[in-house]
Amino acid sequence: MQSEKQYIDLYTEAQQIIKDHAAPVMNEVRDKAFDDFRRLGFPTKKVERYKYTDMQKLFEPDYGLNLNRLEIPVDPYETFRCDVPNLSTSLYFIVNDQFYTKALPNVKLNDGVVIDSLSRVAKERPELVKKYYGKLADTEKDAVTALNTMLAQDGLFIYVPKNVQLDRTVQVINILRSDVDLMVNRRVLIVLEEGAKAQFLFCDHAADDRNFLATQVIEAYVGANANLELNCLEETHAKNVRVSNVYIEQQRDSRASHNVITLHNGVTRNMLDLVFKGEGSECFCNGCVIADKNQHVDNNTLIDHQVPHCTSNELYKYVLDENAVGAFAGRVLVRKGAQKTLSQENNRNLCASKTARMFTQPMLEIYADDVQCNHGSTVGQLNDAALFYMEQRGIDRKEAKLLLEFAFINEVIDKMELEPLRDRLHHLVEKRFRGELDKCEGCNLCK
């Protein structure tokens, strides 16, 4: 319990400071989250959803926290240059876990659309935030969600009213910046009302060569006939620990797409919980992981079919080299009465070295009798025959290996809807395989 004790002691001693620098709406659920965290403790590897990542070890170091909300000396526009060519975006910044108001884009939003500091909106429009905040992210079941809820003081709030479609993709840059080892606790709340449509690109970067621990909780509500595309790209460094929990709720005839791409990291654990609340909905959940050295990437998903006539599609692909460790555990739950469910779940993995390790566990749990559900996983190495064939035609073995890995991972990238983003990722992935992309491509954040 040593890992938990430091956070329990921290909250006991500093809870008033935390509350003084946060909105009342966030504070209303804070004490309950603390009680839940104290009861749960960090999960051990005996807990099914956490058996591939040692959470006790990740949270054991003594990180600093900016509880007094001191302003971080950083100019995002001076340090960040990593845009996606030909993609018209509204650009926002979160520095550590604070919404950066000094860099708000000079873009007129559609009527009624809100993109702002979660803490500020919670103070100005508490009834709107209170309706959604903490309703999906269950602190009673997950210790990381409880810890984030008990410590988070700010983040991002996005609200898209009924039948409004955002003209531009919303790009959110999460920048980690500190002169000391630091823990940050980010919160994101996304609400798409009936008939709304929005596309998001979240990019994670580390500006300093320090040890960072970032917890993140995203709650996304997708109303009837609404359309959400959520893309998450991580390009940090080997000293970064990222623990992200994403919760998505879909209403009738809605569509959601969640794409997570890990190109550079230290230790990453991504959890996705998606629930169908209305019939006729569909989701597309894709993951792309490229890892080498001692990187560790763990993706854990739960797709909960609670109602009939819904469709879920999952495809996660990993390319692991050197001593990298990958894990994928995906559970599709089809509840009683959720007839006519269609579900496809696939995890394909390529180990490019003898020391790379991959753990995979796709699962189906079905309590309805009129469904079409399939799942599968593979772990393999590069095809020697294909390599030999390419060498015989004058292609260098290293180049042949790169081409095969690139072709393998492209299936995931091609499923993304934003063409400029697809083109950019093709470029980044190729440079990553060639060893030409050490950290963030196109910016000087990590130099």
Task: Kindly label every feature range from the protein language model.
Residues 111-115, 124-395, 409, 413-447:
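Conserved beta-strand/loop scaffold segments within soluble protein domains that form the structured core
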Residues 1-146, 315, 321:
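N-terminal amphipathic, basic helical "cap/leader" segment at the start of enzyme domains
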